[in-house]
Amino acid sequence: MAWFDDTYYFEQAQLRIAHITDCHLFSDKQGEYFGVNTAEHFTRALTDIAKQQPDALIFGGDLTQDHSFNSYLLFAELIHNSDLDCPVFWVPGNHDEIDQLNLISGGQIQRAKHIVAQGFELILINSKGNTPAGWVTPSHLEEIMACLVDSDNRHIAFCHHNPLPINGYLDKHMLENGPQLLNLLVNNGRVDALFHGHVHNDYQQQFRELDIYATPASSVQFTKHSATWQQEDKGAAYRMLHLNAEQQKVHIRTDVVWLNE
């Protein structure tokens, strides 16, 4: 099956989307990443997200830290035990294995990478490369182009890796062909924004007329604009998107939610 073959449909022209990323789970609930219990942080974020009553949750990658299959099972357990009643979608991070993500998909956790609402669509891009850095393969770029040209709707894109430098330590692991992907999205003329994770903090950038948003991690944050790898426990975080299609435009309102504030 090609990446975008499975499509999920919403009938409405307004969506509330929760974007949560980089939970870095372990095989058990006591695992800690830089002193942070990642399962506790993720659970706390899911509890708060459920109160927002989103239409969908998009997980932005880096589910696992110890690369165990039990960490994937823990992710599914925490989702299923939460108060969330919406579908959950995902993109793979550099820590993740797509086959393992597919194994926990089914029911509430969806495999679909193409989400269609009235007047706009969401595309979930695979930026996982052979190294911690990101790479969108030539064949996947063709799939993205085909998905975009197949519809006159507005589009919003999601991937894991940052496509532009953030002037920080993780730039060495950014999306290596980020400008190529961004030019494809901008040149299409119907893509309004791209959302990503990976950098463990919130950023807002622009490439030509495309808005780019980084969502902070649900686990631990990496200090902004630091050439060395510095961590901060600022509490669990996620992003909410309020999307509204009107007169061949999609209006985007987005806010980061910091649970320690």
UniProtKB/Swiss-Prot annotation:
Record has Nucleotide-binding as a keyword: yes
Cofactor(s) of this protein: Fe(2+)
Gene source species: Pseudoalteromonas sp. (strain SM9913)
Keyword terms of this UniProt record: Hydrolase, Iron, Metal-binding, Nucleotide-binding
EC number: 3.1.4.-
InterPro entries listed in its UniProt record: Calcineurin-like_PHP_ApaH, CNP_phosphodiesterase-III, Metallo-depent_PP-like
Family classification: Belongs to the cyclic nucleotide phosphodiesterase class-III family.
One of the record's GO molecular function terms: 3',5'-cyclic-AMP phosphodiesterase activity
Entry keyword annotation includes Nucleotide-binding: yes
Binding annotation for AMP: H24, D62, N94, H95, H200
Binding site for Fe cation 1: D22, H24, D62, H200
Cofactor comment: Binds 2 Fe(2+) ions per subunit.
Protein name per Swiss-Prot or TrEMBL: Probable cyclic nucleotide phosphodiesterase PSM_A2567
PANTHER family: CYCLIC NUCLEOTIDE PHOSPHODIESTERASE CBUA0032-RELATED, PHOSPHOHYDROLASE
Residues annotated as binding Fe cation 2: D62, N94, H160, H198
Disulfide bonds: none
